[in-house]
Swiss-Prot record:
Organism: Dictyostelium discoideum
Protein name: Ragulator complex protein LAMTOR3 homolog
Pfam family, one: MAPKK1_Int
GO biological process, one term: positive regulation of TOR signaling
Task performed by this protein: Regulator of the TOR pathway, a signaling cascade that promotes cell growth in response to growth factors, energy levels, and amino acids. May activate the TOR signaling cascade in response to amino acids.
Protein family per UniProt: Belongs to the LAMTOR3 family.
Assembly, per entry: Part of the Ragulator complex.
PANTHER family: RAGULATOR COMPLEX PROTEIN LAMTOR3, REGULATOR COMPLEX PROTEIN LAMTOR3
Gene3D superfamilies for the chain: Dynein light chain 2a, cytoplasmic
GO molecular-function terms, A-Z: kinase activator activity
C-alpha cells in the first residue's frame, strides 16, 4: 500500500499539479477494490467515489471498447460540482476527481505520461501478487 501511495503522490506532484489544482486521485483494480487514494482536503471526493462507481467504469469501458473504434483508455464524467476522469491500464484504474473549473484537456494531455506510469505500477502490483 505504501508503494501505491508514493506513486499517487508522484503523479499528483509531477504530472498533474503543474496545471490542475484541487485534485484527488484514487487507484483501484477492475473490481473496484481501492488500492490507494489521495484525497484533496477541499474535496468531497471521498464521499463521492465508492467501489460501485469504479467497478461500473470498468464495465462501461469494456462496452465502449466493443464499438469497433479500438480499446477505450479513458472515460470523462461531468457532474454538477465535479469532473471525474477514469484511466484504465492493465486492470488498474486511476480515477482523477477535480472541480468543474479544471481543464480536462490538460488532464487528457497528460494521459500518455499517466499510462506509462500506470503500466510500470501495474506490472509491479502483478509481480507482488504472484509472489504471495
Amino acid at each position: 500500500m505504501e508503494k501505491v501511495d508514493e506513486f499517487l503522490e508522484y503523479i499528483k506532484v509531477s504530472i498533474l499539479d503543474k496545471s490542475i489544482v484541487d485534485t484527488s486521485l484514487i487507484l483501484s483494480d477492475r473490481d473496484g477494490f481501492v488500492l490507494g487514494k489521495i484525497i484533496d482536503k477541499s474535496s468531497s471526493a471521498d464521499n463521492v467515489i465508492d467501489n460501485s462507481l469504479i467497478s461500473t467504469f470498468s464495465s462501461a469501458t469494456d462496452q465502449a471498447s466493443k464499438l469497433h473504434a479500438g480499446n477505450n483508455k479513458s472515460i470523462v464524467s461531468f457532474f454538477e460540482d465535479r469532473i471525474i476522469v477514469h484511466i484504465n491500464v492493465s486492470n488498474v484504474i486511476l480515477s482523477i476527481i477535480t472541480d468543474t473549473e479544471s481543464n480536462v484537456g490538460l488532464i487528457l494531455g497528460s494521459q500518455d505520461d499517466l499510462i506509462r506510469s500506470l503500466t510500470s505500477l501495474s506490472n509491479s502490483i502483478q509481480s507482488d501478487i504472484q509472489d504471495m
